[in-house]
Regions:
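N-terminal acidic, proline/glycine-rich, low-complexity intrinsically disordered segments
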Residues: 1-8
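Compositionally biased linear targeting/interaction segments
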Residues: 4, 17, 23, 29-371
């Protein structure tokens, strides 16, 4: 009840404390922002890591390439130094050859380069040097190579038949190569190869291929006849147009070969010819028979048995059993290879006369080669 004159309170007192606030509709926005930021940071970090890894890999690759380059340069310079020291080594061994009643020949130090220079190589090369010299590199200073290594293989190009000698333009160079080529191709076991068609569908016998190789390099326009026993150079008129009649014609070069691979352009030189007379074992360059480098004279001390047999048969009279009987040729190749392995790379002959004497069954190795 209200007293007279009193009025009702328009705002009655609240009960139970404060009135609860209305729930906000944007309550999870902060969580979404945090997750979005973390996602963006993760993507940026992943891209940064990929970019950094790529740059690191590139830097490591450039570092290794630089090490490899200078290791290779070092091996070349060390090899030159070793070859330049050959006269000193030969002089030191002269008394030994005098006891054998022959002058000191050129010592093929390059055949031992990988082992002799192993003292400047990695751990594997150090072990090779230790097995050769019996001396550990720990006893010296500035030896060994960390983080890199090299492998040296030096090949004597004068141990092969030089097919570039006719480019000199003289009859003697032509005749010498003709004799070497005919001696190389003369074995009767190769008859099936020369009696069938070549890759161009043509028949090319021994004389045709021999003449084609010489005509490719000599500067004249006359066809050369390969007959090493004629005693003089023979011409058979103008060079033919064989190369102009091919499906893809090209001119005869009449100049020196730029590389041994260019020999594939010459008439009759197919895969069978290449594998038999040019490069029988590509993984072993010392087995290669022909070359476009060198002086032209074959070094029989470093030549492989097949090349030595070609030199012998090129100078032998027709009908020599060694050149006409495959069994005799095989026997000689085996004996020559055995003698070379027995000497462990040391030169067999001090002079050309010693080589001829050995072929006649005389001298230290004559009995083994003529057996």
């Amino acid at each position: 009840l209200l007293r007279r004159g009193a009025t009702a309170d328009p705002c009655p007192p609240r009960r139970g404390g404060r009135r609860p606030r209305r729930r906000q509709p944007r309550r999870g926005v902060a969580i979404v922002l945090v997750l979005s930021a973390l996602t963006i940071l993760a993507v940026m970090l992943a891209e940064f890591q990929d970019e950094t890894s790529a740059e690191l890999g590139s830097a490591l690759s450039q570092r290794d390439a630089l090490k490899a380059e200078y290791a290779a340069k070092s091996s070349v310079n060390l090899s030159r130094l070793l070859i330049a020291s050959e006269p000193t080594i030969r002089k030191a061994l002269a008394p030994l050859f005098l006891l054998m009643k022959q002058g000191p020949p050129q010592i093929p130090v390059w055949e031992f380069a990988d082992r002799v220079l192993g003292a400047f190589n990695d751990s594997e090369g150090n072990e090779s040097f230790l097995s050769l010299a019996g001396v550990s590199i720990s006893e010296g200073k500035n030896l060994g190579l960390d983080g890199a290594g090299f492998e040296i293989r030096i090949v004597d190009e004068d141990a092969k038949v030089n097919i570039n000698t006719p480019a000199r333009g003289d009859a003697f160079s032509q005749a010498r190569l003709a004799a070497q080529l005919i001696g190389l191709l003369s074995g009767p076991q190769y008859d099936p190869m020369f009696s069938s068609r070549d890759a161009d569908g043509q028949f090319s016998d021994r004389q045709a291929i021999c003449g084609a190789i010489i005509d490719w390099t000599d500067p004249d326009q006359e066809a050369y006849v390969c007959d090493p026993h004629s005693g003089s150079a023979q011409q058979a008129g103008a060079e033919d147009s064989y190369y102009q009649l091919l499906k893809k014609p090209y001119p005869r070069k009449n100049a020196a070969f730029d590389s041994i691979e260019e020999l594939r352009l010459v008439r009759g030189v197919g895969e069978d010819f290449w594998a038999t007379f040019v490069d029988p074992d590509p993984s072993r360059p010392e087995k290669r028979v022909m070359t476009v480098w060198g002086q032209g004279k074959v070094n029989v001390n470093t030549a492989n048995p097949q090349t030595v047999l070609a030199v012998i048969c090129g100078a032998a009279v027709p009908g020599t059993p060694l050149c006409s009987d495959p069994a005799e040729a095989l026997k000689f190749l085996t004996a020559f290879d055995l003698v070379k392995s027995f000497t462990a790379g040391a030169p067999l002959f001090g002079t050309p006369k010693a080589f001829i004497s050995a072929l006649k069954g005389k001298g230290m190795f004559g009995a083994a080669l003529s057996a």
